[in-house]
Amino acid sequence: MPQLNPAPWFAILVFSWLVFLTVIPPKVLGHTFTNEPTSQSTEKAKPEPWNWPWH
């Protein structure tokens, strides 16, 4: 029963995860965010009433 022998597939699994973890994170972390968060004031804006034309 070759599936019970962990030598070939376990080495391939570990090596593939090692490659993924060394290649993918620098690519993902290399992206820059275009919209930097800005601080907003805590005061609520007072809405102005609309002047509806009642024709």
UniProtKB/Swiss-Prot annotation:
One of its GO terms (biological process) is proton motive force-driven ATP synthesis. The keyword Transmembrane applies. Coiled coil: none annotated. The chain crosses the membrane at residues 4-24. Residues 34-55 are annotated as: Disordered. One of its GO terms (cellular component) is proton-transporting ATP synthase complex. Its main location: mitochondrion. It is a single-pass membrane protein. It is found in: Mitochondrion membrane. Subunit 8, of the mitochondrial membrane ATP synthase complex (F(1)F(0) ATP synthase or Complex V) that produces ATP from ADP in the presence of a proton gradient across the membrane which is generated by electron transport complexes of the respiratory chain. ATP synthase complex consist of a soluble F(1) head domain - the catalytic core - and a membrane F(1) domain - the membrane proton channel. These two domains are linked by a central stalk rotating inside the F(1) region and a stationary peripheral stalk. Belongs to the ATPase protein 8 family. This is ATP synthase F(0) complex subunit 8. It comes from Salmo salar.
